[in-house]
Curated annotation (Swiss-Prot):
It holds the Pfam family Hormone_6. The gene is cga. This is Glycoprotein hormones alpha chain. Residues 1-24 form the signal peptide. Glycans are attached at residues 80, 103. It comes from Anguilla anguilla (European freshwater eel).
Length: 117
């Protein structure tokens, strides 16, 4: 049986490279799955050193359940599963000159408005 001296060295090199890649993987939203609790977080894109901008980010619950029969009868296109979700939104919303102004100083889980204009 012939032993090649390069094989253990190559294996150790590959193993150390793998550990280096895993260790250097960023501990950011993608690494955590993007599901922290609903809270205020600084927006790095729009913030300036003298004027930080915060926004509500995080996960709230979502669930799916069988559609009740009485509801299914009233649907134009009946579906078997109904889903319900809440989003992380600003607690206080005011209007200023007919423009919605969201004051992101406190966050909570509430109705998702991302699809509404």
């Amino acid at each position: 049986m012939m032993v090649c001296p390069g094989k253990p060295g190559a294996s150790l090199l590959m193993l150390s490279m793998l550990f280096h890649i895993i260790d250097s993987y960023p501990n950011n939203e993608m690494a955590r799955g993007g599901c922290d609790e609903c809270r205020l977080q600084e927006n790095k894109i729009f913030s300036k050193p003298s004027a930080p901008i915060f926004q509500c980010v995080g996960c709230c619950f979502s669930r799916a359940y069988p559609t009740p029969l009485r509801s299914k009868k009233t649907m134009l296109v009946p579906k078997n599963i109904t889903s319900e979700a809440t989003c992380c939104v600003a607690r206080e919303v005011t209007r200023l000159d007919n423009m919605k102004l969201e004051n992101h100083t406190d966050c909570h889980c509430s109705t998702c408005y991302y699809h509404k204009f």
